[in-house]
Amino acid sequence: MTAEKITQGTEGLNVPNEPIIPFIIGDGIGPDIWKAASRVIDAAVEKAYNGEKRIEWKEVLAGQKAFDTTGEWLPQETLDTIKEYLIAVKGPLTTPIGGGIRSLNVALRQELDLFTCLRPVRWFKGVPSPVKRPQDVDMVIFRENTEDIYAGIEFKEGTTEVKKVIDFLQNEMGATNIRFPETSGIGIKPVSKEGTERLVRAAIQYAIDNNRKSVTLVHKGNIMKFTEGSFKQWGYDLALSEFGDQVFTWQQYDEIVENEGRDAANAAQEKAEKEGKIIIKDSIADIFLQQILTRPAEHDVVATMNLNGDYISDALAAQVGGIGIAPGANINYETGHAIFEATHGTAPKYAGLNKVNPSSVILSSVLMLEHLGWQEAADKITDSIEDTIASKVVTYDFARLMDGAEEVSTSAFADELIKNLK
């Protein structure tokens, strides 16, 4: 078997039996969790395919290790390698201290145009949770990754640049509602039709491919009408224009109410649900954040903008055990580029202690295996995590909240996962 690159074809990824996959080990606890995760992934692939498939890992540098080795936090060689090999896995990266140095995670997303942050959130039986019915949480978040307030277009208070922006807004655009112009910083919030459409397209296609029931567009369009309000409308328009016979939208529902009455609209939606159509609906963000606590079962796939998505992803993760068990991926569904990553931070005080939970990067690697079409290996890891947690053999973060738990180290938890692969 010869190791080869993954390539992008007209029908999606072309995945060889021995793909070369770059990895960034990460800072802080990164080496601990990656050592554990890579053993679990390799064991699952071996068990699923009896040696007919395997991954050749290729380390690339970013973060502290890159800086110590090359003097750069994110070397161009790393970006070029990920661009060439399409798929990568990464541990947590620290953002270097100092003005003018942007987040390495954001830099990777922007350089590779990874427009979707994919965050599936579900509960594993036995995981400690602060809510009464964590089993009702089963959502997949599609967070737009390149626009919104997180685009990084900001101007610091008191600078020449911000004075120019404020002067332009006041004198050229007639803005009168900058309350304290002399001491304001300014951030720009770009939200585009193209950026919205590619995100919503990916979310609806995911819902279709994975037999999901609905896609909720989450926004604050009631206040920010020309950015978040446009996101909602562009999302609905895209759903009908590209997926018309596979979806039923709330805007269609409202039109039927207006023309034929609510009973007719309810009947139309019920018929669409029986036919297996995806229900496209929307929710104002603050109401949505209440509903994920009070009735989470009503939401399935979620498509939202960058800032909303950041809040929603971590709020949902808290309901099912925290970001220590929350997977994430950053994907460009058009070019095939994707980075699968731990969603938590570097936790430097635990670095090298062989103590922390490696589940986030392991489950992110499960997403990677699913993305590659290696579902058998992905399922083996997921089942093993379920069985291992159910047996109460867990790392300290869960053990301290579970009665009768056996606390184990990072590496011992990986050993247990490998033992429980079926």
From Swiss-Prot:
<feature type="binding site">
    <location>
        <position position="109"/>
    </location>
    <ligand>
        <name>D-threo-isocitrate</name>
    </ligand>
</feature>
<feature type="binding site">
    <location>
        <position position="396"/>
    </location>
    <ligand>
        <name>NADP(+)</name>
    </ligand>
</feature>
<keyword id="KW-0479">Metal-binding</keyword>
<dbReference type="GO" id="GO:0000287">
    <property type="term" value="F:magnesium ion binding"/>
</dbReference>
<keyword id="KW-0816">Tricarboxylic acid cycle</keyword>
<protein>
    <recommendedName>
        <fullName>Isocitrate dehydrogenase [NADP]</fullName>
        <ecNumber>1.1.1.42</ecNumber>
    </recommendedName>
</protein>
<feature type="binding site">
    <location>
        <begin position="344"/>
        <end position="350"/>
    </location>
    <ligand>
        <name>NADP(+)</name>
    </ligand>
</feature>
<dbReference type="GO" id="GO:0006097">
    <property type="term" value="P:glyoxylate cycle"/>
</dbReference>
<feature type="binding site">
    <location>
        <position position="105"/>
    </location>
    <ligand>
        <name>D-threo-isocitrate</name>
    </ligand>
</feature>
<feature type="binding site">
    <location>
        <position position="400"/>
    </location>
    <ligand>
        <name>NADP(+)</name>
    </ligand>
</feature>
<feature type="binding site">
    <location>
        <position position="357"/>
    </location>
    <ligand>
        <name>NADP(+)</name>
    </ligand>
</feature>
<feature type="binding site">
    <location>
        <position position="94"/>
    </location>
    <ligand>
        <name>NADP(+)</name>
    </ligand>
</feature>
<feature type="site" description="Critical for catalysis">
    <location>
        <position position="220"/>
    </location>
</feature>
<comment type="similarity">
    <text>Belongs to the isocitrate and isopropylmalate dehydrogenases family.</text>
</comment>
<keyword id="KW-0521">NADP</keyword>
<dbReference type="InterPro" id="IPR024084">
    <property type="entry name" value="IsoPropMal-DH-like_dom"/>
</dbReference>
<feature type="binding site">
    <location>
        <position position="119"/>
    </location>
    <ligand>
        <name>D-threo-isocitrate</name>
    </ligand>
</feature>
<keyword id="KW-0464">Manganese</keyword>
<comment type="function">
    <text>Catalyzes the oxidative decarboxylation of isocitrate to 2-oxoglutarate and carbon dioxide with the concomitant reduction of NADP(+).</text>
</comment>
<keyword id="KW-0460">Magnesium</keyword>
<feature type="binding site">
    <location>
        <position position="310"/>
    </location>
    <ligand>
        <name>Mg(2+)</name>
    </ligand>
</feature>
<feature type="binding site">
    <location>
        <position position="143"/>
    </location>
    <ligand>
        <name>D-threo-isocitrate</name>
    </ligand>
</feature>
<dbReference type="GO" id="GO:0051287">
    <property type="term" value="F:NAD binding"/>
</dbReference>
<feature type="site" description="Critical for catalysis">
    <location>
        <position position="150"/>
    </location>
</feature>
<dbReference type="InterPro" id="IPR004439">
    <property type="entry name" value="Isocitrate_DH_NADP_dimer_prok"/>
</dbReference>
<dbReference type="Pfam" id="PF00180">
    <property type="entry name" value="Iso_dh"/>
</dbReference>
<keyword id="KW-0560">Oxidoreductase</keyword>
<dbReference type="GO" id="GO:0006099">
    <property type="term" value="P:tricarboxylic acid cycle"/>
</dbReference>
<feature type="binding site">
    <location>
        <position position="103"/>
    </location>
    <ligand>
        <name>D-threo-isocitrate</name>
    </ligand>
</feature>
<comment type="subunit">
    <text>Homodimer.</text>
</comment>
<dbReference type="InterPro" id="IPR019818">
    <property type="entry name" value="IsoCit/isopropylmalate_DH_CS"/>
</dbReference>
<dbReference type="GO" id="GO:0004450">
    <property type="term" value="F:isocitrate dehydrogenase (NADP+) activity"/>
</dbReference>
<keyword id="KW-0329">Glyoxylate bypass</keyword>
